[in-house]
Design a protein with these regions (language model features):
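Conserved alpha-helical scaffold segments that buttress catalytic/binding sites
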Residues: 2-200
Length: 200
């Protein structure tokens, strides 16, 4: 059984709940970020767009010690693209460890509205396709559980789980997540991929 580490770069941004309310995912990511900054300034709200260095160090420790034997490191732009990666890797009932600010199971109250794969429900689709079975979500202290399905997700703040307790990973998927990661840090996904590729 494969162990999958899925890392969404928005995991590192601890003030997501503050600036997320200004977001518009119907716009391009760059337009949405311009709107966020404009609305925040209009409301005289100062936003902090820097990653949490402690969370970054935590993930680097995992990459150094638990990703030495990964058979595949994939870089994707949005999280729903992970489905193709898992299919290509022949995943079946894999253990998924999702490092993400968001839960990504389902945000719809009405299941009929959740019939197409999106970046908000990709875990639900990975389960439907039997790509993953056990799901662990590692988020931030202010991440919120919102999914409306019976899919069991073990969830914790990264601060409550020691990095050395994770298993060795077979597949590492890193997601840029442009709507939720400030543009200045889109390059962080590539940097972490290169960091993981350099691990021996």
């Amino acid at each position: 059984m494969k162990n999958i580490m899925s890392l969404d770069i928005d995991f590192f941004f601890t003030e997501m709940n503050i600036y997320q309310k200004y977001m518009d995912t119907e716009l391009t990511p760059k337009q949405s970020w311009q709107l966020i900054k404009w609305k925040a300034a209009k409301n005289k709200e100062k936003l902090h767009f820097e990653p949490c260095n402690l969370a970054l160090e935590y993930v680097k420790n995992i990459l150094l010690s638990k990703c030495k034997g990964v058979k595949r490191i994939a870089l994707i732009q949005e999280h729903d693209e992970i489905i193709k990666v898992l299919e290509k890797e022949g995943c079946s009932e894999a253990n998924l460890y999702n490092f993400d600010y968001h839960e990504d199971v389902s945000y719809q109250e009405n299941i009929e509205e959740d019939t197409e794969l999106t970046l908000e429900n990709w875990i639900q689709f990975a389960r439907k396709k039997n790509l993953v079975k056990r799901i662990a979500w590692i988020g931030q202290d202010d991440s919120r559980k919102v999914h409306q399905t019976l899919i069991k997700v073990d969830s914790t703040s990264w601060k409550d789980y020691d990095w050395w307790n994770f298993p060795d990973f077979d597949v590492l998927v890193i997601c840029v997540s442009k709507h939720f990661t400030p543009p200045k840090y889109w390059k962080l996904a590539k940097e972490l991929k290169e960091f993981a590729e350099g691990v021996e």
